[in-house]
Amino acid sequence: MAALLLAATVARAQYYSWGADAASLRWRTIRTPDVQVIFPDTAGAIARRTLHFIEAARPSIGYGFRHGPLKIPFVMHPENFRSNGLVMWLPKRVEFLTSPAIDSYSMPWYKQLVAHEYRHAVQYNNLNRGVIKGLSYVLGQQGSTVGLLLLPIWLIEGDAVQMETQMSSFGRALQPSFTMEYRALGDAVRSRRNIDRWFCGSYRTNVPDHYHLGYQIAAYADTRYRENIWDKVAWYGARNPYMIFTTSIALKKFYRTDVGTLFAETFDGLNYYWNALPARRNSSRYLSAEPVESYTTYAFPLAVDAQRVLALKTDYDRPTRFVTIDTESGRERAVAYTGSVSTRPAYADGRVWWTEYRRSTLFEQRVNSQLCYMDLDRGKPKAVRGRRHALYPTPTDRGLAWVEYSPDGRFAVTGEAGVQHWEAPAQTELHGLAWDDRTARLYFLATDDSGMWLGRIEPDGTATHLTEGAYITLSDLTARDGRLYFGSIASGYDEVHCYDLATGRQYRLSTSTSGSFSPSADGEGNVLMTTYDAEGYHAARQPIDTLRPVRPSRLPRNVVNPPRRKWPVANLDTVRFTAADSVSSAARHRARRYSRPLHLFKVHSWMPVAVNPFKIIDEHDIDVQLGVTLVSQNLLSSAESYLAYAWNHAEGSVVKGSLRYNGLGIELEVAGTYGGNQVIYAAGQAQPQPIPDKYYSLSAGATLPLVFAAGYRTRMLSLTAAWNFSNGLVANVGKLTYDEATHSFTNLQHIGYREGLHKLTFGIGYSNSVQLAHRDFITPRGYVLSASYALNPTNDHFSDLISVYGKLYTPGFAPHNSLTAAATYQTSIGGFKNPAGESFLSYKSARLIPRGFDSNDINSRNYFAASLDYQLPVWYPEGGIPSVLYFKRIRLNLGADYGQFDAFDYRKGRTETRRIHSFGGDLYVDFNVFRQPASATSTLRLSFYAPSKGGLWWSASLGLPF
């Protein structure tokens, strides 16, 4: 089963679409002998800078592997605040979300992206060899995707993190927070015989992700064997993919080890190193007295008054929300749920300000950072209209200030009328903003080529350095009473620091066992913070009574990281992009217009069988026939298409194709089929059927999906219209004559047929749902409503179909239980009907048919159906067959269905209501195969229902994470 699942996973994952950018963007491209950069004209400076870093990294980015990076295009997406990067086949490209990450370290974002994502291009090139390369000639790029199964995902990401770390002065994996979760867990990581939890994740407790795990194993192995052992693993796998377990075989063959041994040696060594460090005790005291029932994260505690602290709280059972904590009793009060918070909240005069990630109404790749506020006494979050690019809202004595980010890569401090405006220099990122009441100035946290530093905005609109740039990560800037408060890793741990604005001195305030974050002064001589342990991040407080001076340094102390082998690669921290470099780049590599119409098609794959890739994605239906298929997707992810030729004995030759385009916000689709047997719609079995001709059909459709993101709640409205034509033969039922005496049609054999069948469909759908918690599998509250109307505009004898549907989601009787109820109604209107009132020519909706029945068991005459389901988790086994199959969660659904419709009983000579029903259950098994990470969790569903007609009905289906 595991092998079949992986094959199905690849089949679906290879047709992944990143989502379209806004239609208003105008695209350009720069080509070099090694790469192509595709970018909107608004991001021209970002593209030039990124290209410069690519060229600087290229000579050493392949270190440890025998082959360098693929020649691959880089596609820039500048309007998405959810910073990320991705390397894909089908077609091959590197996707860059260029907005700098909010929570970042001391290397500029574009350098981080280049070091990490370009390393993936190296891995892919080393996997695309041998037999895998041969598959690419047979199957196109989808053949190359098979190679991705030959290195585990945790290693692919871990090796990329390792390169990102090696190409910086004090990079990602050296940050104390990168090992903090493992340090807090301690020996618990080695306490389980089955180690798959640490690869596959958990619904019961926190497990660091595969980036953290992969780096630790990769870095240990690199130091232990004095070489990149994954080069030989990739080399062996690409030439022997039929062995399936190629990683295990190669590790045994070349290094006499295996993944389990590497895991054990890695964490035995790490725990030995960490246990030898001097013991540290938290200097802060936890504020909340609430019991910790699951892994919990408090963030950004702020003093409301002397008795209350406001904080964001998230746990495995509930999504993010504001809570107040009584500082005396430790009791909590929930205030309001929020959406996905992008930057820290600020509080002043009874009002809370913060920002949230919110998708635009039309375009998937336009994700904004929306300015929000809430009056604390009312507890109702609201959005500030028009403020969609805001970061770090900060109340001042002249109004609200915030950081504004533009898609061209520039940051600025701006705000309400009267607030000093300052535009940051090019190539300078802003990662914090604070207002100090004593000095009446705005202060900021910046990152540039020199590292991270603190600055002040002067009354004349200029900026002053308070500290020099250093490769020391700073975070969570706040200010009060003449001091700046922030997180710093200068000591080798994540600790709370302050900067005295009067003396220009920096001090460390906290001492932590694992780490402390998000400081803010409470005005009562204390500093609030969050402090980490194995149960999560806790809201905490300590007096400001111990100031430990911090000496300026270019690098932090390296305390928690054991020695690892240093690679001879470029340090991107030393690479600068100057005005002269920009001029030189423009002279060597001219930017040209990138025409979207001319690049609508990019055939990346083919196969010697006929399949419909859209059905693979939409319906999980893999129908393979003899033939050939071409698959296309453009580099902007706005157009997908396929063309297939199939042959089968029953229909002969059939050609099918379809094109989907979503670059305008409206999703457009056209499709066509030619070949096979003409469809015949007879008025009855007694009507003679002619010899069918070749079948053909054309269809076109448009969907307008509108997303109304409102924080905790998301609403969606979808409007659809579709037209379909086929050359089907339709009985001329208007010519029928009926004999009342014999209750029969007298001329059925002579009415003939009419060629051509049109279908026009209109639909509207609306949904309203809330965010899910980590352990939720269905939205706990929400509903779905839809209605559709189908008609044949050219044949009055066809009945129209009207259909409505509704579904309600509610919580069950225990946490993470779900009770859902659904109902539908459909009926045929107009058209030709026999004396019994039944339509010969009508449409039918297959939505909500009692389980155990199908559409042949109902008709559309006053059809009503309802269903009731109750789903709950029953077990979190977290075990299985080590390294092969990991069972993460088992769920049970109990369901009952009911349906009824009108049908004419010819024996009784009257119309009756026929009723059907079924009841039973579904068993859901959430699992991972071959130590795939949490993001690759799949679901097996086994359904068993007893319908009112027939025997026991059962089915099995597989839900994939793509």
Positions of PLM-derived features:
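Outer-membrane beta-barrel initiation region
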Residues: 488, 546-665, 669-670, 749-780, ...
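A flexible loop/linker signature enriched in serine peptidases of the S9 family
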Residues: 173, 313-322, 337-342, 355-370, ...
